């Protein structure tokens, strides 16, 4: 009110008044027509960094995130050796995998909250430092209790990097490119399961299982140096669109040695969050649309994790393979996942643009579109459904091929296909959740990690007893059956999600209107 009064009372030159009216008209046009081409072109760029800089940052985030799954899968080829050396059962070693995944789900909630408050970079460095210490302890431990405790610490430190990767992507990437960049981010998550067993098999067979943890310690040290040297802060409340310099203590070594040429755009800074809220990820899950999409993705992930975890022991028991041979057989998982960048990733971005054209949403490169009036659920899930059906079919085929001890080549082809289509579902699922929760990448990453890892822990713990009871063929069939039985819940999001969001926006707008009337002083 005071600003309006001062503008009215002050003598304003004709030119200034004309400029003010034009600016007001532009703002009203952008508000009333968020998808109008002129209003979109007026929006600020989302990131001042070049495409190569963004790709490099996401590559570092992706490789850092690979530590978490790599710490799980390098372990698989040594399961039998560990059980023998520590004088425990294979079931107890599998329990250590389940406990690892539980902490893998819980710990990122804290890492996400800290990164929202203090920045992505310092939390990355803290997680990597603790991970180095945990692997040092694991390499020197002598009993099962120490193994369990240190695996929990290892899991807590490494898993934070997964949630941070989602946050970095949200800081840097708009919705139209999310499929491509999500594939880059997913690359680290799938390279761990792909290369981990091979590396673990080689190390455990020729140097012993302790060499696995020495390797992980060295890997963590390498990523610590890489992050310290090259990784720049991306938190938009600290650096805005990337052009605002962070505090000196939060600059990469490259930034310290070489001054940025970017012109600081302080208007791009987002409001800084006060305090640390580790429950932010839980609050995201309180939204019914987020909950359904997250839980279905977690259900898929749980089944996929169980497929990966039993693959090593099945190859050893059914085909008599050595640890190195087992590790090599995991490569199709990685190759299939990597290729999803060019299959599923491109399809997801193509379908986003196709739906945008149908719905009248104009796409402008490096401008974040207003998705409140866009049926984003249709754009993302149209691609997901056929890939989910394909994943179910391939998992059933995998189970029965294993059951009848068919030639290993057929099994490897199937696991390649499983990895390719499953990664595509994962990309679409993550892209939709990022679209539904803009500006909450860290908390969202923690929420996805929480649901996926808890479901994965349950799947890994249950799969071996289930196979022992009914066989791997029926176990795989039951897994696909559960996925299909719950699929209608995801279809509800496809058909009703946009309606839910519009209703929530109307309710929120009405609430703000009522609040402003109540808060206004009486004349």
Swiss-Prot record:
A molecular function (GO) term? transmembrane transporter activity
Q: How does it sit in the membrane?
A: Multi-pass membrane protein
Q: Where is the composition biased (Polar residues)?
A: 21-38
Q: Which InterPro entries match?
A: MFS, MFS_dom, MFS_trans_sf, Sugar_transporter_CS
**Similarity field:** Belongs to the major facilitator superfamily.
Q: Give the lineage.
A: Eukaryota, Fungi, Dikarya, Ascomycota, Pezizomycotina
Q: Which residues are glycosylated?
A: 35, 94, 143, 235, 250
Tell me which Gene Ontology terms the entry assigns under biological process.
export across plasma membrane; xenobiotic transport
Which species does this protein come from? Phoma sp. (strain ATCC 20986 / MF5453)
Q: What is this protein called?
A: MFS-type transporter R5
Q: Which UniProt keywords apply?
A: Glycoprotein, Membrane, Transmembrane, Transmembrane helix, Transport
Segments spanning the bilayer are 183-203, 211-231, 291-311, 319-339, 381-401, 408-428, 443-463, 470-490
Q: Which Pfam families match?
A: MFS_1
Is Transport tagged as a keyword?
yes
